[in-house]
Amino acid sequence: MPRFFQLPMHTYARPDYGVPTMNYDEMLAKVSTASGFIAALDQSGGSTPKALKGYGIEEDAYTTEEEMFGLIHNMRARIITAPSFSGEKVLGAILFERTMDGEAGGKPVPTALQDRGVVPFLKVDKGLEDEADGVQMMKPMPNLDALLQRAKAKGVFGTKKRSVINQASPSGIAAIVKQQFDVAEHILAAGLMPIIEPEVSIKSVDRAHSDIILRDEILKALDNVSADHKVMLKLSIPADAGTFDALINHPRVLRVVALSGGYARPEACAELAKNKGMIASFSRALLEDLRHQMTAEEFDAALASAIDEIHAASAT
């Protein structure tokens, strides 16, 4: 058995937050109006080794996929049960499917989040296709409807699904947006809130042009969203501040959140703060200072510092 598995589980004395489990309307109100940001805890199989390495666990610490997923779940449970991870500054958390099905602090993860005032979301995409026409579309999601019903039964509020834009290809970006909104219709029909995530790579040489094409395609797609529905958008921080203002202020958009896209936290927060009305939905920028070797006190102090910095950048 790898050495790491002999370490004790990290535990915290659980305070009584007195926060009841939230119903859909309460979660909707929180996500739409409250101050805070959305934590992205949804690394999938392909990105898990990198996330574990950042956490201080090398690949030789596990030998099977199940051990790997067990380690990443322990990391996420440690975050979710840390005293600083509460609905005061964290609006929501995006979960990987296995995390949704697991437990934190002896409770199902969605329930544990709601008890802390944090709204649960679920990553539903199955990864990316190979690049074509400057973009990477989402792979097929054949069991989406069943997954949505299971998520809703567990108290999940919304979903997230990611595509990637590598070049300023008008036809490629139009295809990305169409696919995203087509899937969003299924999610809305299931009674869940879709987060639409067409990421523009920060490595793209024509990133600013991609931002503009994407904005205009999303504006066209929003015209077809019925008046009784809204969607959320998760976008790369634009190359030029204010590019997405029309999306932030659109009546069919509940909230626009930003991915860190490879920026370290100080730079991600500085860039985000230039875009009024955008809030963070960071993953690596949230987790980058956390290490499995830390004591409970050290871990929570590092997490609290990251939460405070990201919350402040989201409050502009």
Language-model segment annotations:
Residues 2, 67, 171:
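Short, surface-exposed alpha-helical recognition segments that flank or form part
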Residues 3-22:
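Short, Lys/Arg-enriched N-terminal segments with co-localized hydrophobic residues
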Residues 18-157, 165-167, 217-316:
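Alpha/beta catalytic barrel-like cores
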Residues 106, 173-177, 208-211, 293:
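Conserved strand-to-helix beginnings and helix N-cap segments that scaffold or border functional pockets
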Residues 122, 176-190, 211-226:
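Alpha-helix-loop-beta-strand connector modules within alpha/beta enzyme cores
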Residues 132-136, 159-174, 201-208:
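Surface-exposed cleft-lining segments at the edges of enzyme active sites
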Residues 152, 173-176, 193, 200-204, ...:
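Conserved mixed alpha/beta catalytic, RNA-binding, or beta-rich assembly cores of soluble enzyme
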Residues 157-163, 191-199, 234-235:
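Short beta-strand segments at enzyme active-site cores
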